[in-house]
Amino acid sequence: MVLRSLASPAALTDPKRCASVVGVAAFAVRREHAPDALGGPPGLPAPRGFRAAFAAAYAVAYLAGGERRMLRLIRRYGPIMTMPILSLGDVAIVSDSALAKEVFTAPTDVLLGGEGVGPAAAIYGSGSMFVQEEPEHLRRRKLLTPPLHGAALDRYVPIIENSTRAAMHTWPVDRPFAMLTVARSLMLDVIVKVIFGVDDPEEVRRLGRPFERLLNLGVSEQLTVRYALRRLGALRVWPARARANTEIDDVVMALIAQRRADPRLGERHDVLSLLVSARGESGEQLSDSEIRDDLITLVLAGHETTATTLAWAFDLLLHHPDALRRVRAEAVGGGEAFTTAVINETLRVRPPAPLTARVAAQPLTIGGYRVEAGTRIVVHIIAINRSAEVYEHPHEFRPERFLGTRPQTYAWVPFGGGVKRCLGANFSMRELITVLHVLLREGEFTAVDDEPERIVRRSIMLVPRRGTRVRFRPAR
């Protein structure tokens, strides 16, 4: 009876039913899973003997209800709560900025960031910097940092501008289309040019195609299902992923060899060339396989999240005309302050990823509660970004809140935090500002739909339900 109730999508959305389900389950184990004698966090019940069934029911409920349901649970149980979830095991969900700071600043041998990557590791690959633990992660990160920060970003601006203009020439005029769809193509074009240093359109398409195939697998429900069934070999035997990786190897390894043999390597400024030239503290180079793995990581991570953010920014701007006018004024007259505030606010209310995670390698204390080894600790980005304790009118789109002030480190976490914070955050911000300015300076856009888009989950991403439908015409 309890299990059937939990499996129902209504069970964790209706407060009365949620309370009754929890109460019945609590009776079965003598009490609801509240802070126990050892100081464990509160959370959903999972009676001994039925734990796997409850974990499956909770997983189904989450997949059916997504972040809306999770936010209701967070409001019920507080800033840290626990629940078992099929394929993830014991999960502790952190939804408070102070506790997020504890997670992000914990020793790297206590909380493992690579283990926390979860389903995405199946797409990035076991050699990706994302899934490495310390000290290997830090070694690779230091070598990858220079091409994505500081003066290097300025060199990419003309590439981004030219790609944006070229893309606009292919868009339908005065007919509805999904901004998310064209943003994906645009961002892939940009990232391929920036990373590989190519500009011939046919070569860009040839390099981009296998990455696009791999990325499509990463944003499909197939990834979610295969990750849940990974112990049955669903990830080991995945022909579509194997084909995409083989195609990537064919194009990338050949490019690496060409670049190593290039006598003018030192004059090039693309990311591939900088990685081939990079030397560690002891003079060591990255191997071909390490470069390949990191290039895959950069292409995939720098593509979908940025495209999704651009689509969300358009959805919000087109339904907030005053903000749209201010961004357009900066695009035409110069300045970036309000545009930056718009992107920060977009990432606050519409982060492309709902969460980031670590795995406890040993017992630790978070928020005064004991968390056992093996627990997956999930920092819930949406809950933290929309905290009423930090933000006035937290659910409203108000870019002005970020004018003249930087987002708080642990109360604004769309890029994660700690040593695993997104390496490409600065590049993403520069890319979004540049693309927005070109589009709004050289194009006119209107919303197709009267109401803002609903958030829906696509695998590990949160995207606009209809892809942000717009009408476009070149500016007069």
From Swiss-Prot:
SUPFAM superfamilies in alphabetical order: Cytochrome P450
Q: What is its EC number?
A: 1.14.-.-
Question: Cell division among the record's keywords?
Answer: no
CDD domains in UniProt: CYP110-like (cd11053)
EC main class here is: oxidoreductase
Q: Which GO terms describe its molecular function?
A: heme binding; iron ion binding; monooxygenase activity; oxidoreductase activity; oxidoreductase activity, acting on paired donors, with incorporation or reduction of molecular oxygen
Q: Which Gene3D superfamilies match?
A: Cytochrome P450 (1.10.630.10)
Q: Which cofactor does it need?
A: heme
| Ligase is among the record's keywords | no
> Which GO cellular component terms, listed alphabetically, does the Swiss-Prot or TrEMBL entry include?
plasma membrane
Q: Which of UniProt's keywords are assigned here?
A: Heme, Iron, Metal-binding, Monooxygenase, Oxidoreductase
Instruction: Tell me which Pfam families the record gives.
Output: p450 (PF00067)
| Entry binding sites for heme | 422
Similarity remark: Belongs to the cytochrome P450 family.
Return the protein name. Answer: Putative cytochrome P450 137
